[in-house]
Amino acid sequence: MHPLRKLREAGKPTLAQISELLAENIVFNSPILARPLQGRELIAPIFTQSSQTRGSGTYTAEFKLDERTTFLRWVGTMDGHKFESMEIIVDNEQGLITERTIALRPYPALKLFRDAMYAALKDKLPPDVWEYPAPSLNEGTLQAGATQELVGNL
């Protein structure tokens, strides 16, 4: 059993307990954040909060993909909505987590989870992790004249 799963199944883990499992340079990829995050000090509070936020449920699957990579599936409910997470965890030679990538479904439950996490962590994380920046005109947004030209060519 992966140490993160074992810790979460034992109850609500503390920040210190979560921190002990993480490599200093851990990378976290989550659909509730606009970009990957890196570093134990930034990520440990997120993992701790998510254990308290995500509601009741159980791990239903665990597979070792190779000697350092684990797949976990968790199913539960949050505010009465079915909630499912799938994650891939990569550990280093010392058994510390170096990368964690999560997928969450369905969308309504993901949104509830994201909103709850935002409320709990908005002042603890940089603002740019919550929203994608608005595209500039140079990044693919069409100007009015270009739109008219495209429509005229159809």
Where are these regions (language model features)?
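C-terminal and inter-domain tail/linker signature
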Residues: 1-154
